[in-house]
Amino acid sequence: MSDILCLYYSRTGTTRTVMEQIAELLEAELVEITDGKNRMGIIGYLGSGLDAMKKTPEELLPFETAKPLSAYTHVILATPVWAGRCSSITRSFLIGHGKDLPKKVSYVITHMGDSSYDKVFAQMDQYLSTPHTFGLSLQPKADDYHQKVYDFVRTIRAENGQEAQ
């Protein structure tokens, strides 16, 4: 296993699927963060978007990593985009743990729209000690989905001195 940690929140399973692929390709530890709320269906969808717009912090359920967050060489944090923002769960994680993360932090954001999501990366960066290293903006139903994932993994490997596979 590498010194890379893949952390994610996923409401519907889409972000989870992406991070499972990335973690497997990087031989990285994979950890889910959640608040434990049922956010499924239209009510969950609307509530999640409202939480993101209000920037409502959520109380997260405890999560375990193999070592302290600062001990990893690289952390990859993934979130769905809700109402043009990172999920309230991801924001809560960053508020509570952003300063504990190593200098190398990269983001994976999943979304359905065609817009530029650079603002989401900037929103997330405000909770870190240094700006993110790399960002992957991913539309899971897009034709170039798999290529973008593989290119991102190659970039992370190169940054961390791992051989390409």
Where are these regions (language model features)?
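Short, glycine-/small-residue-rich phosphate/pyrophosphate-handling segment
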Residues: 106-144
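Short, conserved loop/helix-junction motifs that constitute active-site signature segments
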Residues: 69-70, 95-104, 128-129
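N-terminal beta1-alpha1-beta2 submodule of the flavodoxin-like/Rossmannoid cofactor-binding fold
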Residues: 1-77, 84-87, 131, 150-165
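Charged helix-capping and loop-helix junction motifs
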Residues: 89-95, 120-122, 148-153
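Solvent-exposed loop/turn segments at secondary-structure junctions
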Residues: 12, 37, 82-84, 112-115, ...
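Short, well-ordered alpha-helices that flank and scaffold nucleotide-derived cofactor binding pockets
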Residues: 20, 24, 92-96, 126
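Redox-cofactor binding/interface segments in oxidoreductases and associated redox assembly factors
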Residues: 77-78, 107
